[in-house]
């Protein structure tokens, strides 16, 4: 095996660095659960873990190193093309089909290599195995595999990581309607987090409990940079359409998009400054005070 990469990033540094303020080397950081501003963080020291992509995180293995190399290829493309894509979108210019597919692959890759997807996959796999083995004697095998080995198998993270490379997920994104939010506001910019791409159930789909949480129906939100947000929505009658919306002077729209990151990220949010974070903390504090009166 070639030289190992021990510190493996879940969110690429090339993405985090684009959210740095001018002449700044660290990002403002919000602890989402505690709604507390933490000390500023360097992109090189966050959103990563020792042998994170190994099948058993923390332990070196060949799978984790191969995943790291594959992610590196994607990140190299991102670093080389991000500026051009951002400029096009700010100028309300549609991407070519090739550019849109490549960016869609990146978006789905970011989503399915994330903390939340891994946690959800591990939880679902264990829950499913619990249901299969419920009431079985310990010596009963499952397709010739002992129950002990079966539980060891579902603890592997590769089942979650592998989905980050599925072409079909990227292809599905290209067929959605893309709303591009353009934000040139110098004070309130788009934020990012330990989940560079988030997804959520759109309001219209909440009445479809069987389908609302499917990847196709859910809305994917990607803050490409402090200036550009991409909202990929399921709208069958508007498949593949583009809509460019300038939100520079619409602070409520900027806050709405940022709040989605607060609500659907893993643990931490990051930005070039703490303007939005402080505004959010003040709002929640005021709300609590009103509720107690």
What are these regions (language model features)?
Residues 1-7, 11-293:
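Alpha-helical structural context detector biased toward long hydrophobic helices
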């Amino acid at each position: 095996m070639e030289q190992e990469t021990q510190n493996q990033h879940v969110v690429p540094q090339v993405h985090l660095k684009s959210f740095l303020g001018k002449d700044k080397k660290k990002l403002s950081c919000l602890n989402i659960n505690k709604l507390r501003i933490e000390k500023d963080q360097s992109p090189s020291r966050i959103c990563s873990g020792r042998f994170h992509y190994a099948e058993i995180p923390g332990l070196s293995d060949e799978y984790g190193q191969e995943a790291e190399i594959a992610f590196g290829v994607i990140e190299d493309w991102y670093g080389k093309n991000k500026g051009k894509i951002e400029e096009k979108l700010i100028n309300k210019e549609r991407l070519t089909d090739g550019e849109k597919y490549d960016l869609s692959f990146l978006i789905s890759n970011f989503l399915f290599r994330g903390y939340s997807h891994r946690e959800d996959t591990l939880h679902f796999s264990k829950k499913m195995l619990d249901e299969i083995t419920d009431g079985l004697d310990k010596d009963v095998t499952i397709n010739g595999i002992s129950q002990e080995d079966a539980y060891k198998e579902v603890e592997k993270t590769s089942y979650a990581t592998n989905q980050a490379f599925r072409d079909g997920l990227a292809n599905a994104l290209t067929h959605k309607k893309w709303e591009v939010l353009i934000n040139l506001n110098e004070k309130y910019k788009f934020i990012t987090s330990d989940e560079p791409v988030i997804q959520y159930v759109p309001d219209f789909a909440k009445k479809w409990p069987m389908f609302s949480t499917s990847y196709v129906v859910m809305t994917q939100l990607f803050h490409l940079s402090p200036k550009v947000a991409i909202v990929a929505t399921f709208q069958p009658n508007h498949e593949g359409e583009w809509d460019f919306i300038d939100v520079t002077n619409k602070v409520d729209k900027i806050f709405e998009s940022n709040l989605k990151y607060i609500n659907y990220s893993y643990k931490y949010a990051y930005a070039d400054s703490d303007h939005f974070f402080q505004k959010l903390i003040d709002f929640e504090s005021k709300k609590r005070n009103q509720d107690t009166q």
